[in-house]
Regions:
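Hydrophobic positions on the alpha1 helix immediately C-terminal to the Walker A/P-loop
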Residues: 15, 19
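Sensor-1/coupling segment of RecA-like P-loop NTPase cores
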Residues: 135-138
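Gly/Ala-rich phosphate-binding loop of Rossmann-like dinucleotide-binding domains
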Residues: 24
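The conserved Walker
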Residues: 8
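Short hydrophobic/aromatic beta-strand immediately N-terminal to the Walker A/P-loop
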Residues: 2-5, 41
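Conserved inter-motif catalytic segment of the P-loop NTP-binding fold
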Residues: 28, 34-129, 133
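Conserved glycine(s) of the Walker
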Residues: 11
């Protein structure tokens, strides 16, 4: 598990999209780091259209064809509350339809935190445990 932590509007989602596209397409990340090629499940909790535009721009930059039939990048159909078991189970149902998931992106923490206090150890612990659960199942 890795977290991209920085103030708002500093490019965290750009980095996540870049990494996700590299893994989904089996290309070295930043032409320097080897990746394990496979499916990526991207949980989009804000800016769905912005993420799609960034993915399209990434494909143009790296001259990689983007088609529904060949993409390994899968987007959630709904938001996620990572502190609510029913929300997590609904997301898992969608994820189980995809084989060989190598990366799960949760974008953003604030929107998937379910009204918890990010500074409260109990709330953050619950969030991390539920992320661990996703990671271990997939």
């Amino acid at each position: 598990m890795t977290a991209l932590v920085a103030p708002s509007y500093t490019g965290k989602s750009f980095i996540a999209v870049d990494m996700a596209c590299a893994i989904a397409n089996g290309l070295r990340w930043h032409e320097e780091f080897d990746v394990t090629h496979g499916n990526v499940f991207y949980i989009v909790s804000e800016g769905r259209h912005g993420i799609r535009r960034r993915v399209d721009a990434w494909h143009r930059k790296f001259r990689v064809a983007l088609t529904r039939e060949t993409t390994n990048l899968h987007f959630s159909r709904q938001g996620l509350n990572l502190r609510d078991k029913s929300s997590i189970e609904a997301m898992k149902s969608d994820m189980r339809l995809i084989e060989n998931i190598k990366l799960i992106v949760v974008d953003t923490l604030a929107r998937t935190f379910g009204g918890g206090n990010e500074n409260a150890p109990q709330d953050m612990g619950e969030f991390i445990n539920n992320c661990d659960d996703l990671m271990h199942e997939f």
